[in-house]
């Protein structure tokens, strides 16, 4: 559990500090180009889910986040053998859930600020996201890898 907190808390702090920086220095919907035609910092409110889908459902996503937080905490305090990949996944997920939940409670929306132009058809630019979103996405990838490893070792 201590290991997970040592991972989660700095990532949560990084998420909140970067969002505070954006809110103080970048006006709503403004873009600050960092690398021309590739990367900008923006200030985009998101009341929906990933990629801005299901907009206008902040209360619903607060409830979902609280439930997800409770499930992750249950999984963390349950006695089970150590598993590094699973524990890293849970730590990343915890940081991401808390980061976006904090935004929803404080601001009424999630603060998205990283905008990449990957020159990919139908995603040009890629939708804005934040550190918490990155933590959640990486956690999902790690969970998938973990489940395949478990299936392979069982079979």
Mark where each language-model region is.
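Alpha-helical transmembrane bundles and membrane-interface segments of multipass inner-membrane proteins
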Residues: 1-155
């Amino acid at each position: 559990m201590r290991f997970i907190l040592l991972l989660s808390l700095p990532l949560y702090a990084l998420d909140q500090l970067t969002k505070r920086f954006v809110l103080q220095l970048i006006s709503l919907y403004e873009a600050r180009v960092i690398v021309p035609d590739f990367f900008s910092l923006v200030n985009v409110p998101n009341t929906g889910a990933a990629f801005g889908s299901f907009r206008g459902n902040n209360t619903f996503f607060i409830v979902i986040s609280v439930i997800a937080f409770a499930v992750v905490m249950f999984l963390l305090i349950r006695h089970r053998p150590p598993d590094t990949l699973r524990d890293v996944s849970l730590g990343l997920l915890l940081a991401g859930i808390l980061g976006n939940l904090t935004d929803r409670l404080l601001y009424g929306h999630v603060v998205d600020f990283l905008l990449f132009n990957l020159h990919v058809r139908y995603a040009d630019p890629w939708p804005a996201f934040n550190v918490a979103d990155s933590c959640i996405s990486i956690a999902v990838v790690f969970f998938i890898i973990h489940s395949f490893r478990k299936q392979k070792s069982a079979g």
